[in-house]
């Protein structure tokens, strides 16, 4: 049932994105209390309790109340899942003998099922994660559907080539699947991150053991049921719920896992890289933290820059690895920009994420909530000027008022460390070379943005900024068509786009002796 009061254009403008929805389309009503249908481990296309029989609670961040309990997988369960994935990857198995085009058909079928259950999945995501329903439905689910369809199209187009070589030989290359892929996904975009990991792995013929975030397991488990319904053979996809130090570590350390892909904090990324090296030198893809700069030059469109820098930070409650968490503004426009930024932050609607006009929901859990408030206190202690927000919103749940700091110095911890919350620090700069040096003076390098009307300056910044993605006069434009990943301690490897397929295949060279070679 559609609610015609709340139209899509505001949300599309929020991210500068276009979706398959007409701007005249109304949002459907959410399901405020979606039924929890799955809470067990998904191994070999079957549902299982944890070997230990342990469970853990998943909490509604809007209220702080327990939604339900989910199986707590650990090393023993990971072993079972890896065994199932290895059997599914066995030479001559149904999955290995399946045509690449058929793998693409299965991924398209999965996209169809996600589209069919879009309202339910978006509602489940909002319940477990706390993000506004309109963002779950319009942005996240749109990206999920597109990533499965996009990678489905690549399934029979990612291939080797013939190579002319000297002598009486014929040579060609094969792009072969890596094998059993361990995947560990975060809680900030559960379904999106699941799609980013699963789609390229399956398109290229791998099998998967995925550990989902303990804060947000529900939507990933429901999607597991759709994987079975779509027709993927047993063992191709296995979903484990559990904690990072147990289930996640077991995947990273496992001697029969050929590759691990992780999205999360830089600190955990270091541990996973080390575990991979200490075990079987499994291939590693890491998409980690960020402290991304948004740079506003004096010639920028002021209204547009204020809007974009606001959403660059506050989108998804600030819980975004590529959030624009350092806003540098040229000195001549700094005070006007600051005033407009504070005004916009004060107007941001915080509240129940199931209400269709809500712009900001709660932080994902109590730990994250308290960590962010701690950084706000630290910023004040270090001498930054608190201009708005800085405290909890409401009496229950994990809500924080949109917070803006001025007078922030580069050596402050709120300027150097990833806060991962609705806290926007503003900085002043005078010269282009100065701001480039300051923007790059971080251990991170995930993303950056520049706002200017001068094309020469925009191109210069795009070359000078040390980041995997540079946006010009926009922010947070991430789609399945383009590679995404970081420089420095923001990770290694790329996800999405054609480049993202490389991480899931090995290139094999086959050379054949021939009796006579002709051109």
Curated annotation (Swiss-Prot):
N6-succinyllysine PTM positions: 54, 366, 385, 401, 428
Record site feature (Transition state stabilizer), residues: 188
Transit pept. (range): 1-19
EC number: 1.2.1.3
InterPro entries named among the record's database cross-references: Ald_DH/histidinol_DH (IPR016161), Ald_DH_C (IPR016163), Ald_DH_CS_CYS (IPR016160), Ald_DH_CS_GLU (IPR029510), Ald_DH_N (IPR016162), Aldehyde_DH_dom (IPR015590)
Any one Gene Ontology BP term: ethanol catabolic process
GO molecular function terms listed in the Swiss-Prot or TrEMBL record: aldehyde dehydrogenase (NAD+) activity
Family annotation (Pfam families): Aldedh
Enzyme class: oxidoreductase
Enzymatic reactions: an aldehyde + NAD(+) + H2O = a carboxylate + NADH + 2 H(+)
Active site: 287 (proton acceptor), 321 (nucleophile)
PTM annotation (N6-acetyllysine): residues: 53-54, 366, 385, 401, 428, 431
Keyword Mitochondrion attached: yes
Pathway: Alcohol metabolism; ethanol degradation; acetate from ethanol: step 2/2
SUPFAM superfamilies attached to this UniProt entry: ALDH-like (SSF53720)
Binding site for NAD(+): 264-269
Subunit description: Homotetramer.
Biological function: ALDHs play a major role in the detoxification of alcohol-derived acetaldehyde. They are involved in the metabolism of corticosteroids, biogenic amines, neurotransmitters, and lipid peroxidation.
Name of the protein in question: Aldehyde dehydrogenase X, mitochondrial
Lineage of source species: Eukaryota, Metazoa, Chordata, Craniata, Vertebrata
